[in-house]
């Protein structure tokens, strides 16, 4: 059980760090505009060497930002639940802590997939046509790696829950 929780905590830490880095950086998309290099993220865009805040309140920007923030919050709360499960803190005695941590990581995975799907759909259908020479960049890719890490953290915690439940049911009372 502890090896599953240790693997879950490792994946959770890495996934959460990747989520925060992907959300905070401005290299989701790179393109050429009027012959100069430009890139943009969720919060700002840069033309040449000068960066500007994204002040437009466009629905897909707001949805992507909101889902990324929700994903990071779920991942952080999953880490807290995972640490409590690892340390056997008796805070929630009626609720399985590994199961709760697994659910939080699966929720985090769902939210980041929704954010990346919205961003991908709008970028490919609208912005991709607007800018001829464009590509997704490393911040966007970190978001997809964070999907894998939070998903595997959820898998590890569900396995830890299953091992714990099998041991609990097999011991005589």
Curated annotation (Swiss-Prot):
GO MF, any single term: structural constituent of eye lens
GO BP: any one term: cell-cell junction assembly
UniProt cross-references to Gene3D superfamilies, sorted A to Z: 1.20.140.150
Bilayer topology: Multi-pass membrane protein
Glycosylation sites: 43, 61-62
InterPro entries: LMIP (IPR003935), PMP-22/EMP/MP20-like (IPR050579), PMP22/EMP/MP20/Claudin (IPR004031), PMP22_EMP_MP20 (IPR004032)
Modified residues (Phosphothreonine): 171
Compartments (UniProt record): Membrane
Signal peptide start and end residues: none
Cystine pairings recorded for this chain: none
Side of membrane Cytoplasmic, spans: 1-3, 88-98, 162-173
Phosphoserine PTM positions: 170
Tissue expression summary: Eye lens specific.
Coiled-coil stretches: none
Positions in the Extracellular compartment: 25-66, 120-140
Family assignment from sequence similarity: Belongs to the PMP-22/EMP/MP20 family.
Disease: Cataract, multiple types 19: An opacification of the crystalline lens of the eye that frequently results in visual impairment or blindness. Opacities vary in morphology, are often confined to a portion of the lens, and may be static or progressive. In general, the more posteriorly located and dense an opacity, the greater the impact on visual function.
Protein name as annotated: Lens fiber membrane intrinsic protein
Gene name of this polypeptide: LIM2
């Amino acid at each position: 059980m502890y090896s599953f929780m240790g693997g879950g905590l490792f994946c959770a830490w890495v996934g959460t760090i990747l989520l925060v880095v992907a959300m905070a950086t401005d290299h989701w998309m790179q393109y050429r505009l009027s012959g100069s290099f430009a890139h943009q993220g969720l919060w700002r865009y840069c033309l040449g060497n000068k960066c500007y805040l994204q002040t437009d309140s466009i629905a897909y920007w707001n949805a992507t930002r909101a889902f990324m923030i929700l994903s990071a919050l779920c991942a952080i709360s999953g880490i807290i639940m995972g640490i409590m499960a690892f340390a056997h803190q008796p805070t929630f005695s009626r609720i399985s802590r590994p199961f709760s941590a697994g659910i939080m990581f699966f929720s985090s995975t769902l939210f980041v997939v929704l954010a990346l799907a919205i961003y991908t759909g709008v970028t490919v259908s609208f912005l991709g046509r607007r800018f001829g020479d464009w590509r997704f960049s490393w911040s966007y890719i970190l978001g997809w790696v964070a999907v894998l890490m939070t998903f595997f953290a959820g898998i590890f915690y569900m396995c830890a829950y299953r091992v714990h439940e099998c041991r609990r049911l097999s011991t005589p009372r």
